[in-house]
């Protein structure tokens, strides 16, 4: 449990640094916008990622792009981007990204794996991720986070790095408000069936 606590603290610090960098990049992009051509597969997407069929549609698009059976290491849904880390052979992992308003995912891109644990310990079957839970989890996480004006910005499903034997992958919902330095956030976790685990 001590290892889990320190891991969560380090993950929180890492996420804070990442979001601060993203906020800075977004500010710079607003100051110096660069016109880009409209991709052929682009369309206007107006639905909320966490209250619609967008997660299922995104995973279906990634399935088509992979073109064969695979297991998942991580699924991450955010309003602007869906990320899937997949393994077709149980030995290597590839990343697929699907941007909001696009029909075709980008990928595969190889993922550099670190650590000594067997890859198989971090992979799960596609059916383990019950995407029907996402709207309910998103609503519940906002309530549990208790951040005034907070909203869900990402939902992910993966095994925790530090876990007990036999534990299932975990849903992690990020709730936040504002941008650094005026920024509040919390991670709310649930087991594979949607039972609340923790908020930090």
Model-derived features with residue positions:
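Hydrophobic single-pass membrane-insertion segments
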Residues: 2-15
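Extracytoplasmic low-complexity, Pro/Thr/Ser/Ala/Gly-rich segments
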Residues: 12-85, 89
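Predominantly extracellular/lumenal beta-strand repeat domains
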Residues: 14, 39-50, 155-163, 169-170, ...
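Short, compositionally biased low-complexity segments
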Residues: 20-39, 99-120
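General structural signal for secondary-structure boundaries
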Residues: 47-52, 126-135, 190-191
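Exposed beta-strand-loop-beta-strand "reactive/processing" segments of non-cytosolic proteins
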Residues: 61-96, 157-189
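A short, surface-exposed beta-strand/turn
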Residues: 94-114, 181-200
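Long, charged/polar, surface-exposed segments that mediate recognition or autoinhibition
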Residues: 107-153
